[in-house]
Amino acid sequence: MGKLELNKKRKKSALYNTAFELFTTKGLAKTTISDIVENAGVAKGTFYLYFKDKYDIRNKLISHKAGELFSEAHVALEASHITGFTAQLHFIVDNILDRLETESSLLGFISKNLSWGVFKDAFQEQADDDDFPFFQEYLNLLDQSDVQYDSPELLLFTIIE
C-alpha cells in the first residue's frame, strides 16, 4: 500500500473515530459535519470525498463497527473449531455480547441507530474494501447448515435486535 493510500486510510479512520466519539457523547442531532472534520483534523472537502452527509457516515459507521465485532467473533470461531450452524451462531452471539458488555458506548450507538432500513444497507454492503465481509460469512455459515431459511436477513436482524 502506497503512501497516498495510507494517508487516505488514516483520514477516513480519523473521520470514523471522531464521528463515533461525537455521536456517542453529543448525539447525532447535536453533531455537525464541521464538528467532525474539526476534531478529526481534516478539511470539510475530505469528509465529502467519503460521505454524503452525517447520516451516511452514521450508517457506514454502523457497518464498520459491526464488521469489527463480527471479524473478531469469526477469528475466535475459527480458532474454536466449533461445527454446526446453531453452535457456531451461539458462539458468535456470545462473543459479540461479551464485547458489547465491556463497550457500552458501542452498544448504545448500535442500538439507537439500528433500524430495518439501516440494517439492510449496512449489513449487505461493506463500508470499506478492507472491512470484514460479515454478511457474506453469515450466509456461508447458513449454506453449510442443513436447514434452509426463507429470510436470512430477517433472522440476523432478529438476533441482533
PLM regions: where:
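Short hydrophobic/aromatic patch on the recognition helix
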Residues: 41-51
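Short helix-capping/turn signature of helix-turn-helix
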Residues: 51, 112-118, 157, 161
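Solvent-exposed, amphipathic alpha-helical segments
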Residues: 14, 18-25, 68, 72-76, ...
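Amphipathic alpha-helical packing segments from all-alpha helical-bundle domains
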Residues: 99, 118-146, 153-157
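Amphipathic alpha-helical segments used for helix-helix packing
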Residues: 98-122
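Hydrophobic alpha-helical connector segments
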Residues: 60, 75-102
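Basic, helix-initiating cap at the start of DNA-binding domains
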Residues: 1-26, 30-39, 56
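Alpha-helical DNA-contacting segments of helix-turn-helix folds
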Residues: 51, 58-65, 72, 110
